[in-house]
From Swiss-Prot:
A Pfam family assignment: ACP_syn_III_C
Protein's recorded name: Beta-ketoacyl-[acyl-carrier-protein] synthase III 4
Gene expressing this chain: fabH4
Record-level GO BP terms: fatty acid biosynthetic process
InterPro entries in the record: ACP_syn_III_C, ACP_syn_III_N, FabH, Thiolase-like
Record's subunit section: Homodimer.
Region ranges (ACP-binding): 243-247
């Protein structure tokens, strides 16, 4: 048993292809002004047909491991949050473990769509605390370009592809936990408000319902997540929300009240990458030096199933 765990490194990966608003204007009835005014997105990255989601995840995971100074043999748990897995089995976590050469890990996928990474992080934290794992690799990865209808201007303008990863390790004796208690839940009666359904599977949502829920119900829940770590929103150095769209991120962040925090706005450049959005944004903040080791950051995912999960972490 351990008193707690912490994130020791992060990493991210995005495909090379950039799809601009102008590109989309040549595909559907839209414009750069229309997209920016409604969702605040300028560009997004799109993976090619030869770039499966486990490849995106593998690249991000490898970067996180390298940043932590670890080898694949040091990992005994792989948790991947994704809703765009290639197959039901083998799962994405097993595919990532195989790509990286991780010997004999527990490997599991979690499908909680846009709230997936914070659920996965809590799962890894619990496993390390219980002594069931010593080092965990937690990945959020999605290839949303495969599940969007590219003729539907209300959804195709939103999505992007990518992956982000974190290494989770046990705290040293006497060290304060670096991952706070998770606050999670769902609104199952509204689960159809965000969905990936049909054959082939397609992403759809009730945009106004999601907006109202996110901007009216979630601020209080996010503040409660801070309270569980013994902090006030004003104590936060960073707020990393699921990057749904800028018109949700900005009012939600403002209502949380983290007046001293940098607010991740990676959605402007990356679009909505579902489970990848939080670790992708966190890794970029670290890469740019906008957060430093030990800074308290609120990670808060929300979306499909109308699920949510949030926790305060200490930045690596």
């Amino acid at each position: 048993m351990h008193q707690g765990s912490r994130i020791t490194a992060v990493g991210h990966y995005q495909p090379a292809r950039i799809l601009t608003n102008e590109d989309l204007a040549g595909m559907v009835d839209t414009s750069d002004e229309w997209i920016r005014s409604r969702v605040g997105i300028r560009t997004r990255r799109i993976a090619g047909p030869d770039e499966p989601v486990d490849e995106l995840a593998g690249h991000a995971a490898a970067k996180a491991l390298a940043s932590a100074g670890l080898t694949p043999a040091d990992v005994d748990l792989v948790v991947v949050a994704t809703s765009t897995a290639i197959d039901r089995s083998p799962n994405t976590a097993a595919r990532v473990a195989a790509r990286l050469g991780i010997p004999g890990p527990a490997a599991l996928d979690l499908n909680v769509v846009c709230a997936g990474f914070t659920h996965a992080l809590a799962t890894a934290d619990h496993a390390v605390r219980a002594g069931s794992a010593s080092r965990a690799l937690v990945v959020g990865a999605d290839k949303m370009s495969e599940v969007v209808d590219w003729t539907d201007r209300t959804t195709c303008v939103l999505v992007g592809d990518g992956a982000g990863a974190a290494v989770v390790e046990a705290c040293a004796p006497g060290e304060e936990p670096g991952i706070g208690p998770v606050l999670w839940g769902s609104v199952p009666e509204m689960g159809n408000a965000v969905r990936i359904e049909g054959t082939p599977p397609r992403f759809a949502q009730e945009g106004q319902s999601v907006y109202r829920w996110a901007t009216t119900r979630l601020p209080a829940i996010a503040r409660q997540a801070c309270e569980r770590s013994g902090l006030e929103p004003a104590d936060l150095a960073a707020v990393v929300l699921h990057q749904a769209n800028l018109r949700i991120v900005e009012p939600l962040a403002a209502k949380i009240g983290a007046v001293n925090a940098v607010v991740a706005r990676d959605v402007v450049e990356s679009g909505n990458t579902s489970a990848a959005s939080i670790p992708l944004a966190l890794s970029k903040l670290a890469e740019r030096g906008e957060i430093t080791t030990g800074d308290p950051a609120l990670l808060f995912g929300f979306g499909g199933n109308l699920s949510y999960a949030g926790q305060v972490v200490r930045c690596p």
